[in-house]
Amino acid sequence: MAAAAAAARPLVTVQSLEGDMATDQTQTVALPDVMKASIRPDIVTFVHSNISKNSRQPYAVSKKAGHQTSAESWGTGRAVSRIPRVPGGGTHRAGQGAFGNMCRGGRMFAPTKIWRRWHRKINVNQKRYAVVSAIAASAVPSLVLARGHKIETVPELPLVVSDSIEGVEETSAALKVLKQIGAYSDAEKAKDSHSIRPGKGKMRNRRYINRKGPLIVYGTEGAKLVKAFRNIPGIDIINVERLNLLKLAPGGHLGRFVVWTKSAFEKLDSIYGSFDKVSEKKNGYVLPRSKMVNADLARIINSDEVQSVVSPIQEGSKRAPLKKNPLRILNTMLKLNPYAKTARRMSLLAEAERVKAKKEKLDKKRKPISKEEASTIKAAGKAWYQTMISDSDYTEFDNFTKWLGVSQ
């Protein structure tokens, strides 16, 4: 679903830094059309999940794993399973099952192969649409906040900084710049989030995790700010001509906090073009238009232009009645037979009377036993038990066994 573009201001203020030449008038730049493009989270998620697979390294288990023994099945008739077993003796390993995926020391089920389809091809136009959507989403404050960035002290979005930031060489100076433009709190959040990864990933060269901070986009090739910002945790630096969806929407989530330099911001129109003008850098590329300029569908349907060509409502048309089963639907039965409700109620009352009468009849038959009668019954049971034990006690055991003919 295409989301309406929220960044609709005609001009964007360029934030000046300490040491810049003071001017009477505040610098502004025109908002590029790419910031007004439709935002498609479905395309961004699809493209991100596919291009992120292109950096995978093929892996597989050894072809020999689990088969480095001369095990053979014992066959049937040995009262053991027919799984191949290790030959020999004198060791615990002899006679153990081998080869199968259910065996200790056996191979895995369907051993992994390196000829898996690791990489994915994505249409060029689809990749461009995803990047354009990510750029447009970076100018929407609600999406940037929803992604978790700290932008409470940022003057405005999109955030454009003067080109003097490209001359920053030291990391200490870079931190001062972040404080001036209000992006330091987001960088601090990324730094404080540095922690050890939970789970098995910490054993697999993915030991530490940390959140993403601001993305610095510069326009001059070979700018000095790359070395100044590259050592700050969570901050990424990228050239405007090499914008990457993995940096603009990490994890496929829209709304990365982006800091643009003035030169980079001015290049966006030439790189991505506009809704009417073809891009200068991308052959024949024009920004995608939204399917609907106005998302209020009810307003469109009820407009004079649409209503003037819509066919009038047909009057006098007869619709086939919906047939309902009165045996299952009570309201339908009551329309056909109002007495059905009374008949059902009478049957329920009659059933309740029958249950009550049966209970009273059984209660009369079941007379309660007094304590004296209960003790008499218990004593009779004990006497019978003692009689049974005494009758089974054979004193003349030898004569009895001779009579049975049992030899000792």
UniProtKB/Swiss-Prot annotation:
Keyword set for this entry? Ribonucleoprotein, Ribosomal protein
Under the heading Gene3D superfamilies, the entry gives: 3.40.1370.10
Instruction: State the InterPro entries in the record.
Output: Ribos_uL4_C_dom, Ribosomal_uL4, Ribosomal_uL4_dom_sf, Ribosomal_uL4_euk/arc_CS, Ribosomal_uL4_euk/arch
Which GO CC terms are listed, alphabetically? ribonucleoprotein complex; ribosome
- One short Pfam name that applies is Ribosomal_L4
Q: Which Gene Ontology MF annotations are present?
A: structural constituent of ribosome
Q: Where is this region: Disordered?
A: 58-98
Instruction: Please name the GO terms of the biological process aspect recorded for this protein, alphabetically.
Output: translation
Its family remark reads: Belongs to the universal ribosomal protein uL4 family.
Mind telling me what this protein is named? Large ribosomal subunit protein uL4
Which organism does this record belong to? Prunus armeniaca (Apricot)
Recall the taxonomic lineage recorded for the source organism: Eukaryota, Viridiplantae, Streptophyta, Embryophyta, Tracheophyta
